[in-house]
Regions:
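Positively charged
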Residues: 1-157
Length: 157
């Protein structure tokens, strides 16, 4: 598979609303594999298709429990609240305090276009919200409470 270039803040593609995936083509499967490779190479916990320049509703996440592929994800339910540092591969070297739901339930399709629902708490809930925001042209910095701060490579999400 191939590594893709991660777009950084200021790139207009990050501000656009992504289109739903209508069918799973070989090209879309290749994109998903490339996104996973790119996320792991960058030591991230999540990556959305617009971060690699593709305006499709696809995200990949791995919070340490194995990869999760979400095609056309929709948040069904949220509850609770958590505030913590959040970073983004599209805003390297920075982080900021963001409040997100502590529980999230999402409806999505997997890499084979099989429908499923997934629940996440804590870091997984944060990652799901963060990545789905990308699909609607939003970056976490829009939600930061206070100022961004510098982070070392090991701390980045």
């Amino acid at each position: 598979m191939a590594l893709r270039t991660i777009r950084v803040q200021g790139d207009p593609v990050l501000e656009k609303i992504c289109q739903p995936v209508k069918e799973l083509t070989p090209r879309t499967k290749e994109l998903i594999e490339d996104m996973l490779d790119t996320m792991y190479e960058a030591n991230g916990v999540g990556l959305a298709a617009p971060q690699v320049g593709i305006l499709k509703r696809i995200v990949v996440i791995d919070v340490g429990e194995g990869p999760v592929v979400m095609v056309n994800p929709v948040i069904l339910e949220t509850s609770g609240e958590q505030t913590g540092d959040e970073g983004c591969l599209s805003i390297p070297g920075k982080a900021g305090q963001v409040t997100r739901p502590n529980y999230v339930k999402v409806h999505a399709f997997d890499e084979n276009m099989e429908e499923y629902e997934i629940e996440g708490t804590e870091l997984m809930a944060r990652a799901m919200c963060h990545e789905i925001d990308h699909l609607d042209g939003h970056l976490y910095v829009e939600k930061v409470e206070g100022q961004l701060h510098d982070v070392t490579y090991e701390e980045e999400e």
